[in-house]
Amino acid sequence: MNETTLFDRVGGQAFFDDLVEFFYVAVEQEELIRPMYPEDLTESKKWLALFLAQYYGGPSVYQEERGHPRLRMRHAPFRITKKARDAWLRAMHFALENVA
């Protein structure tokens, strides 16, 4: 049985690239979480798109280029409160609603 991954069903890497573009449009408007990101979002966009693609069954480019995600370690410097969590979720909801 050949299972199709979510990565394949949504159209591959292009979907995740577009999703992340919309996500960061919303992040730019979230005063609480915007300071958690670098001024230039280019690298953040690249890594998030590759991470999400890999997580949902795409190629392991993220891990090959960056190693284990170590999410807890990467986010440790930030105070992620319930309000910050909700701001992140709003940004991702916006992205999901707007991605083609």
Name what the model sees in each region.
Residues 1-100:
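Core of compact, soluble alpha-helical bundle domains
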